[in-house]
Amino acid sequence: MLLTALNAISPIDGRYRSKTKSLSAYFSEEALIKYRVQIEIEYFIGLCELPLPQLIDFNPSLFEELRSIYLHFTSDDALQIKEIESTTNHDVKAVEYFIKKEFDKLELQDYKEFIHFGLTSQDINNTAIPLSVKNAISEVYLPN
């Protein structure tokens, strides 16, 4: 079904779409998935910087490659995560599995078990959502 003002869930993405379109980069499901990926990656980097003993040999020069996972996040990446979610029936777990696949591509298999280490889904959501609000305010509502 094509999204129109008549079949949208709310007037925000229906009748007012022309005024709220820029907010989809912050508040759409794809955006939430991207923010979750960002939080998971930055948390992993934070564990490396502690340094957590098991991550002490992680090369900090790889941090930018890790960040590129969310900095270059695409709609196809979001679709991959949704496909994983269709198996896991868990949105945040699907993000974790996606990142583990990305670690495999980067040949970082030895560190995969520290993705989402010590976290709950609420830890991710309760950080991702406020970050999306903060960014929307600074980049859309109150731009420089």
Region roles according to the model:
Residues 2-144:
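A helix-coil-helix interface module used to build multimeric assemblies
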